[in-house]
Amino acid sequence: MSQSVPMTEEGYRSLQDELKHLIRVERPKVVQDIAEARSHGDLSENAEYDAAKNRQGFIEGRIKELNDKIARAEVIKPGDVVTDKIVFGASVTLFDVDTDSEVTYKIVGEDEADLKHGKISVTSPVGRALIGHRLDDEVRIKVPSGLKIYEVVNIAYM
């Protein structure tokens, strides 16, 4: 059996929205583009046709991928979590010992990760290192630039 894919409700909705858009908008558009390119004659040297067929392949592949992820989705509601440990869905504020600064991350599924918005994947090196820690724990994380040392100063589930 396939492994479940943990994600937040927001991430699940985002995948569903993308799937609907691909099926309702992008797929019909590319079919129309292929038909139009075909009408231009010789397909062997028709760049428009080749581009549209490539786009169709990408769209169909992405639809299949999204259907698979949605079917295997395990929606986790952070508000339902009762624990003092860092787990999936937690918003974690860390104090960087080296820079005397704080950073907050929300631990989310792979498809939801967006570092610009403070969302890190549960499978990322930082996400994996944080899982299971508690308030006031010191967390050592190996990053490309070396070893980072953080102190967990807040854990929230919203």
Swiss-Prot record:
InterPro entries: GreA/GreB_C_sf (IPR036953), TF_GreA/GreB_CS (IPR018151), Tscrpt_elong_fac_GreA (IPR006359), Tscrpt_elong_fac_GreA/B (IPR028624), Tscrpt_elong_fac_GreA/B_C (IPR001437), Tscrpt_elong_fac_GreA/B_fam (IPR023459), Tscrpt_elong_fac_GreA/B_N (IPR022691), Tscrpt_elong_fac_GreA/B_N_sf (IPR036805). Keywords: Coiled coil, DNA-binding, Transcription, Transcription regulation. One of its GO terms (biological process) is DNA-templated transcription elongation. The keyword Coiled coil applies. One of its GO terms (molecular function) is DNA binding. Pfam families: GreA_GreB, GreA_GreB_N. Residues 48-74 form a coiled coil. HAMAP family: GreA_GreB. NCBIfam families: greA, PRK00226.1-2, PRK00226.1-4, PRK00226.1-5. Necessary for efficient RNA polymerase transcription elongation past template-encoded arresting sites. The arresting sites in DNA have the property of trapping a certain fraction of elongating RNA polymerases that pass through, resulting in locked ternary complexes. Cleavage of the nascent transcript by cleavage factors such as GreA or GreB allows the resumption of elongation from the new 3'terminus. GreA releases sequences of 2 to 3 nucleotides. PANTHER family: TRANSCRIPTION ELONGATION FACTOR GREA. Belongs to the GreA/GreB family. This is Transcription elongation factor GreA. It comes from Syntrophotalea carbinolica (strain DSM 2380 / NBRC 103641 / GraBd1) (Pelobacter carbinolicus).
